[in-house]
Each structure stands twice: as C-alpha cells, then as structure tokens.
C-alpha cells in the first residue's frame, strides 16, 4: 500500500528504520502555472508493508535531502 509523506523529518525517520533497504529518487521537469519550468523530485522508500513517497518542488531542498540519506541505504536514481 502506498502512502504520501509531507514532512521531511518524518521521511528521514522512515529511512533509518531497519526494514527499509532501498530508496528511489526520481526527478521530473514540470511547468508551473506561468509556464516556467521547475524540477519536481520524488523520493520513494520501500518499507516492509508500504511504499512511502515524498514530493519536493524545491531543487535546493532536494539536494540537501539526498545528502542526508543514511549511507547504509541503497539509493537508485531515475
């Protein structure tokens, strides 16, 4: 079952759990209402019972979050 997480701190706590082994980072290029392009980054973490997703529209926050992921977590970039 999939769940969407909106809080970054809660997402980082999920990545430190023992049952979480892999994370997927997907970067999409989208347009805002004014037609200006921006990067949307999706972080997907697979737990034992659920797939947790965090969506971030700020590229700076996304880079910091990628760096703060635990080193034991296997990260796939799409």
Swiss-Prot record:
In Pfam terms, one family for this protein is Ribosomal_L38e
What's the main place this protein lives?
cytoplasm
Q: Where in the cell is it found?
A: Cytoplasm
Instruction: Provide the Gene Ontology terms for cellular component.
Output: cytoplasm; cytosol; cytosolic large ribosomal subunit
The GO molecular function terms of this record are: structural constituent of ribosome
Cite the entry's keywords alphabetically: Cytoplasm, Ribonucleoprotein, Ribosomal protein
Gene3D superfamilies membership:
3.30.720.90
Which InterPro entries does the record associate with it? Ribosomal_eL38, Ribosomal_eL38_sf
Instruction: State the remark under miscellaneous.
Output: Present with 50200 molecules/cell in log phase SD medium.
Described by its record, this protein's role is as follows: Component of the ribosome, a large ribonucleoprotein complex responsible for the synthesis of proteins in the cell. The small ribosomal subunit (SSU) binds messenger RNAs (mRNAs) and translates the encoded message by selecting cognate aminoacyl-transfer RNA (tRNA) molecules. The large subunit (LSU) contains the ribosomal catalytic site termed the peptidyl transferase center (PTC), which catalyzes the formation of peptide bonds, thereby polymerizing the amino acids delivered by tRNAs into a polypeptide chain.
PANTHER family registered for this protein in UniProt: 60S RIBOSOMAL PROTEIN L38, LARGE RIBOSOMAL SUBUNIT PROTEIN EL38
Query: Which family does the entry's similarity section mention?
Result: Belongs to the eukaryotic ribosomal protein eL38 family.
What is the official name of this protein in its record? Large ribosomal subunit protein eL38
Organism lineage reads as: Eukaryota, Fungi, Dikarya, Ascomycota, Saccharomycotina
Gene, per the UniProt record = RPL38
């Amino acid at each position: 079952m999939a769940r969407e997480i909106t809080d970054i701190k809660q997402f980082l706590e999920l990545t430190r759990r023992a049952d979480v082994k892999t994370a997927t980072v997907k970067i999409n290029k989208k347009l805002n209402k004014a037609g200006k392009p921006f990067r949307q980054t999706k972080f997907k973490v697979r737990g034992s019972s659920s797939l947790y997703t965090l969506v971030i529209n700020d590229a700076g926050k996304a880079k910091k979050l990628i760096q703060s992921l635990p080193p034991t977590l296997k990260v796939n970039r799409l």
